[in-house]
Amino acid sequence: MPLEPVSLDDKYDLRKSRIFVTGFQALVRLSLMQKERDRQAGLNTACYVTGYRGSPLGTLDQQFTRAGAVLAKNDIKFHPATNEELAATALSGSQQAELRGEGRFDGVFGMWYGKGPGVDRSGDAFRHANFSGTSRHGGVLALMGDDHTAESSTTAHQSEFHFVDVMIPILNPAGVQEIIDYGLYGWAMSRFTGAWTALKCMHETVESTAVVDGSLDRVKIVIPDDFAMPPGGLNIRLGDSVLGQEARLHDFKRDAMLAFVRVNRLNRVICTGGPAPKIGVITVGKSYLDVRQALDELGLDEVRCNDFGLRLYKIGCPWPISRQDLTDFAAGLDLVIVVEEKRSLIEVQVREELYGTANQPVCIGKKDEKGNWLFPVKGALDPNDIAICIGERLLGYVRNDDLAARVARLKEAQRALAETQDVAARVPYFCSGCPHNSSTVVPEGSRAYAGIGCHYMAQWMDRSTLGFTQMGGEGANWIGEAPFSKRPHVFQNLGDGTYNHSGSLAVRAAIHAGVNITYKILFNDAVAMTGGQHVDGNITVVQIANEMAAEGATRVVVVTDEPWKYPTGTKWPAGLKIHHRDDLQEVQ
């Protein structure tokens, strides 16, 4: 049998259905698929993609840039933003393109991307955008790049609760295939409900590679026919009142979300539990894959799950979840186990919706039946721990020597793992030749604050550097500390990317507060930590120097390996001096 011909171009060739892609590439293909599906439906739409680069969505912008030629042919505009909340605001504008009769297309569907801190800082923009709504043939997907174990962030992030707070429904894919599937459902739901749709993009998902079905007709969107639209519909409108937007969101849009999720079966039973189900497992996204691995470790396929009375429910939309879906799932069960990483989003809805129902089952998740930690909020979940939890409770209903032996082996393996010492720990360091390697050194007796970027690593080195803030807050902490400290002065490291993103406001605030602080703006013209991309806007050393002088900085100097590279006549601010990097300590 001859091998199927494969090309690197297949991933964006919509004539090919079976494709080999990463999660990032799947998101690029997703935009192409939506455009073509609209075309086949008789719509002339465009797409607007914007956001701020950052891991775990760290190379998404590169994938969109590389696909620029094919995207341009399909009216898909990729436009990196200065920061996340401005990207969200721009996407809100994309939904207004047809409102005044000035639109060039039938609609613009949008995609926002950012990591957890970007979701944090965009809350107000999300709230305003979701209140005003989406266009009928537009819709917006918000990709939240969550980092549950803080592998590339200053904090461990779980962004779902931010979207719940602004009432944006959430889809949580388990694998690359569902990135495409849920993306298409997400845009359709956004159009139907008039609300944005969030798509959770953990690095375990988007950084995976898989062979997927990229057929244009794979996903069959069903529009609910039992939902009564209010007068004027749910989409964005001109002259809308604030209280009218609020009322529509609470009175109609949430119900529209539930109707869409239910009719499209985004939450579905995987194993019924056979004729006499006793235990039900509810899970979502990456945790669903962990549960499937746990069941494999226990030797439980669908047949044995049904034999043992184990029902499995896969959630695609963790918020909102309908009462009817949960009561249907829980019917006849004695125990419900909710498996989800970080804080409990699904478990609290299960408890709320099942409370007071007939034959209400016991519900465990974060804590067990006795109130002890079961699946802790911190860190990530381990499939072996999930397997032990499920296996032990199944053994309370069935006697099976093989299952008991498997649970015992897993317990022993976890005990051995807990006793294993980490003997190969290595502290990250700057790349060879990186200017940060010398720029972050401070004079003896001085101290510095770190910030967001590679120079965060200076805290792990012998550089008297300790402490950091959120992105864009660098140095503002000294405004509050300085009046109460014996120390007269500190240094603050600030990357050029962060300066452009929002850090310039912190410098302005420090100047206005009159505190004694030296900002070391570490310029290397690259977002080195997330792919080496150029800083958006192509800012220059000359531009930054003039901005700092205009803000009122007492003294501005430039330290460089190549003082001679700036030609005579360069428009520096008055009094600026240029020094060689060898003189850094003297300058400081």
State where each predicted segment sits.
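Conserved thiamine diphosphate
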Residues: D146-W196, M202, A228-S241, P488, ...
